[in-house]
């Protein structure tokens, strides 16, 4: 399927009521600045805003309620990804080096973000510009990803740090928010 000059939806894509696909802001050189692959779902309240860049979402992905995805520097999401509610992915950043000049007047940088296939991003996570997330990675809820993550890594925290690898046994105890410990035996 093809919608307008800036948006392309593949077969079986589900765009739920209340989701926003903003293609009007795309004034950049990209002929198509929003592409969503076969079988992917965009849930109510999710917003996809390419701006002057592009957003490319692979096959069988789910973008959950209230997620906010920008495309200024380019955003590529591989097949079979799960992006949980209220996640923010922003491939741009403000320049703030000069304390004399207001931040709004210093411009922006935009490198782009690449997310591999079969990645799960937990609720309220933030993914910042310039990051590459490897295939099969898992990002914990509320984490802020500021640097690249290797394939199959499990990352949590602010800033996110790798605490394990999918498919390997974790024998350590991980403190939970109440101060007690949770025993981890197998993460798959």
Task: Describe each PLM feature range.
Residues 90, 97-99, 171-181:
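Mobile, glycine-enriched helix-loop/loop "lid" segments at the mouths of ligand-binding/catalytic clefts
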Residues 1-5, 174-188:
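Membrane-proximal basic amphipathic "stem/tether" segments
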Residues 132-156, 160, 173:
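C-terminal/domain-terminus segments
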Residues 164, 170-171:
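Double-stranded beta-helix
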Residues 4, 14-127, 158, 166-167:
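Flexible, glycine/small-residue-enriched loop-and-beta-strand segment within the central core
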Residues 154-156, 163, 178-180:
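Non-catalytic C-terminal accessory region of glycerolipid acyltransferases
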């Amino acid at each position: 399927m093809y919608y307008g000059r800036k948006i392309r939806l593949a077969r079986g894509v589900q765009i739920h009521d209340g989701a926003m696909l903003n293609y009007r802001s795309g004034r950049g050189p990209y002929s198509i600045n929003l592409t969503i692959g076969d079988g992917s779902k965009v849930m109510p309240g999710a917003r996809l805003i390419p701006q002057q860049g592009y957003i490319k979402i692979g096959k069988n992905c789910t973008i959950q309620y209230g997620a906010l995805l920008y495309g200024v520097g380019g955003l590529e999401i591989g097949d079979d990804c799960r992006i949980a509610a209220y996640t923010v992915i922003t491939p741009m950043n403000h320049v703030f080096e000069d304390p004399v000049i207001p931040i709004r007047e210093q411009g922006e940088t935009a490198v782009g973000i690449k997310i591999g296939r079969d990645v799960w991003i937990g609720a309220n996570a933030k993914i910042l510009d310039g990051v590459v997330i490897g295939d099969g990675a898992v990002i914990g809820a509320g984490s802020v990803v500021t640097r690249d993550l290797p394939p199959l890594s499990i990352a949590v925290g602010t800033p996110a740090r790798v605490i394990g690898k999918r498919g390997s046994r974790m024998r350590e105890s991980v403190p939970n928010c109440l101060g007690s410990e949770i025993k981890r035996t197998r993460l798959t």
